[in-house]
């Protein structure tokens, strides 16, 4: 198939960016979206032009780095996948595809389609962990019985890969689905309940400090989340915060 690509190009975080049109030809419907961009970049390099910078690593929907806003949707028109899992069969010959970086004040553009998402890392560092005594008397990890329902729900929350689609698709650039998932995966487990109060207060405080917007319960984040993280996690985070604040 032959396609027109409208891609955001920006030299660095301090430069102004613009949309630039490119043509790609003979693209196989079996290619992944990133493979299609690889083809574009090979052509640009062959002509002595600067290739389009984009983030990627695993290309298996695990790392969350390949975050792109494609035709007005985080990760593109398919559901339950990341950009690297999107295939060109979702598009038609002759289509025009608009490709942008994730847009949020807390995700400044580094170059082209790459944004700085270290705000998520700082939120995680604020409390997204369980402290373990490693003095030599550490208890075996499997010694504490956990109800299957709690384990399953915690695992559902833990599937969050921190890609930032929830922020990009939210009209308020809210990170509450991400933070809610990270709070929930520990709050549901007995190992995580010891530090539950400090965890939720510290993570929410860091989220606010990073400049993310507030949640107004639109629900777009859940729809476009590649892992289908439920809004239930936001409700659980709010309950945990209320308990920690009284």
For each feature predicted by the language model, list its residue ranges:
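Functionalized membrane-embedded alpha-helices
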Residues: 62, 68-70, 221
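Ferredoxin-type iron-sulfur electron-transfer modules in oxidoreductases and energy-metabolism complexes
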Residues: 31-50, 97-246
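Eukaryote-biased recognition of intrinsically disordered, low-complexity regulatory segments
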Residues: 1-22
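Short, contiguous acidic and Ser/Thr-rich linear segments
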Residues: 20-32
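Short strand-turn-strand beta-turns centered on an Asx-Gly dipeptide
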Residues: 8, 25, 70-72
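Glycine-rich phosphate/adenylate-binding loop and adjacent beta-alpha elements
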Residues: 70-94, 99
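Short, structured protein-protein interaction patches enriched in aromatics and acidic/basic residues
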Residues: 53-65
């Amino acid at each position: 198939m032959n396609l027109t690509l409208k891609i955001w190009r920006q030299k660095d975080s301090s430069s102004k960016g613009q949309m630039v049109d490119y043509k790609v030809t003979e693209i196989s419907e079996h290619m992944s979206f990133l493979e299609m961009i690889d083809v574009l970049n090979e052509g640009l390099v062959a002509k002595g032009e600067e290739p389009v910078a984009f983030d990627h690593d695993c290309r298996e929907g695990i790392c969350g780095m390949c975050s792109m806003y494609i035709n007005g949707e985080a990760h593109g028109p398919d559901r339950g996948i990341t950009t690297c899992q999107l295939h060109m069969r979702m598009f038609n010959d002759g289509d025009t595809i608009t490709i942008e970086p994730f847009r949020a004040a807390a995700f400044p553009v580094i170059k082209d389609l790459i944004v700085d998402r270290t705000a998520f890392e700082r939120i995680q560092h604020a409390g997204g962990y369980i402290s373990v005594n490693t003095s030599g008397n550490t208890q075996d990890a499997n010694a504490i019985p956990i109800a299957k329902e709690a384990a399953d729900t915690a695992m559902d929350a833990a599937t969050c890969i921190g890609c930032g689609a929830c922020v990009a698709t939210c009209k308020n650039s809210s990170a509450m689905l991400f933070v809610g998932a990270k709070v929930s995966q520990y709050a549901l487990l007995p190992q995580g309940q010891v530090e539950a109060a400090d965890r939720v207060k510290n993570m929410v405080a860091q989220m606010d400090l990073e400049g993310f917007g507030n949640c107004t319960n639109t629900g777009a984040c859940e729809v476009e989340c590649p892992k289908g993280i439920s809004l239930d996690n936001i409700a659980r985070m709010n309950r945990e915060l209320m308990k920690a604040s009284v």
